[in-house]
């Protein structure tokens, strides 16, 4: 499939105004300069494929050919829809420039023929590319290439979401452990139960803050009795009290 090289070859109708954001996988931004060099049939395929996979398509003036945003993660792509050995220098120069600017960059190259594939492989080594910096994805046709792009963007988005979920889970577990430790410290004070400990936590906060609180402050901000407030103050401030053996 040959690419149209002039913007005058662009015959598709302009995209409709964007609809209100709906639940989906994310947003795909397509470079307007890249779009204007492609066959309209490929652009129509891309638009339909994105819609079928719950991505919203925007046309923007951006440096890479595509940027996918999946919530917390942005992934950029260079998409060469028909490898041209006469243009290899410009392609790899652009790759080197963008890989310094973008954290997540992939290069998808359509090499429909054996000769194009061999030419691409020679160029890859000629320009000193390192495996995975960035990752190159050779494909046999543009449609397959774009399907690969969407799969990569989606997979990375899922991994990022799972990482966030895992981190939140760990934070919740740590919070529960801290709460348990907090309650154990306070309920080790003679006469203080879980209700009292929770009341102190909500009204005053940390162990350090409770240790510094006065009897008056505890009585004004919790439902603890005078005896319990006195016990707490003595526990944290009277060495003869907190160093002596206690029998519950």
UniProtKB/Swiss-Prot annotation:
Residues 1-10 have a biased composition (Polar residues). Highly expressed in anthers and pistil during meiosis. Expressed in pollen mother cells (PMCs) during meiosis. Expressed at low levels in roots, shoots, leaves, flowers, and glumes. It is an enzyme of class 3 (hydrolase). It comes from the Eukaryota. Pfam families: HHH_5 (PF14520). GO terms for biological process: chromosome segregation; male meiotic nuclear division; plant-type sporogenesis; pollen development; positive regulation of reciprocal meiotic recombination; reciprocal meiotic recombination; resolution of meiotic recombination intermediates. Disruption phenotype: Complete sterility of male and female gametophytes due to altered meiosis. Striking reduction in the number of meiotic crossovers. The keyword Lyase does not apply. It is found in: Chromosome; Nucleus; Cytoplasm; Cell membrane. Its EC number is 3.1.-.-. The keyword Translocase does not apply. InterPro entries: PTD (IPR039172), RuvA_2-like (IPR010994). Keywords: Cell membrane, Chromosome, Cytoplasm, DNA recombination, Endonuclease, Hydrolase, Meiosis, Membrane, Nuclease, Nucleus. One of its GO terms (molecular function) is endonuclease activity. Residues 1-25 are annotated as: Disordered. GO terms for cellular component: chromosome; cytoplasm; nucleus; plasma membrane. Essential for normal crossover (CO) formation during meiosis. Essential component for the formation of class I meiotic COs. Interacts with SHOC1, another meiotic component, to regulate CO formation, possibly by stabilizing the recombination intermediates during meiosis. PTD and SHOC1 may form transient heterotrimeric or heterotetrameric complexes with HEI10 and/or ZIP4 to promote class I COs formation. Does not seem to be involved in early meiotic recombination steps involving double-strand break (DSB) formation, processing, and single-strand invasion. Interacts with SHOC1 (via C-terminus). Interacts with HEI10. Belongs to the ERCC1/RAD10/SWI10 family. PANTHER family: PROTEIN PARTING DANCERS. This is Protein PARTING DANCERS homolog. It comes from Oryza sativa subsp. japonica (Rice).
């Amino acid at each position: 499939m040959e690419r149209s090289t002039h913007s005058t070859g662009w015959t598709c109708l302009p995209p409709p105004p964007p609809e209100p954001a709906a639940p989906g996988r994310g947003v795909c931004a397509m470079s307007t300069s890249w779009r204007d060099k492609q066959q309209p049939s490929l652009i129509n395929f891309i638009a339909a494929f994105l819609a079928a996979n719950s991505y919203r398509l925007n046309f923007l003036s951006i440096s890479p050919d595509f940027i996918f945003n999946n919530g917390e993660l942005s992934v950029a792509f260079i998409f060469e829809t028909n490898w041209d050995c006469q243009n290899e220098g410009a392609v790899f120069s652009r790759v080197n420039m963008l890989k310094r600017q973008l954290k997540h960059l992939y290069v998808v190259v359509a090499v429909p023929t054996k000769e194009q594939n061999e030419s691409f492989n020679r160029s890859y080594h000629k320009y000193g590319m390192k495996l995975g910096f960035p990752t190159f994805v050779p494909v046999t046709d543009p449609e397959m290439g774009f399907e690969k792009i969407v799969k990569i963007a989606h997979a990375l988005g899922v991994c990022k979401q799972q990482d966030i979920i895992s981190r939140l889970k760990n934070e919740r577990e740590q919070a529960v452990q801290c709460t348990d430790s907090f309650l154990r410290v306070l309920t080790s004070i003679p006469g203080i139960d879980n209700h009292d400990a929770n009341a102190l936590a909500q009204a005053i906060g940390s162990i350090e803050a409770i240790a510094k609180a006065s009897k008056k402050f505890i009585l004004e901000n919790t439902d603890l009795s005078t005896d319990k407030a006195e016990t707490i103050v003595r526990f944290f401030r009277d060495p003869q009290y907190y160093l002596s053996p206690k029998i519950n």
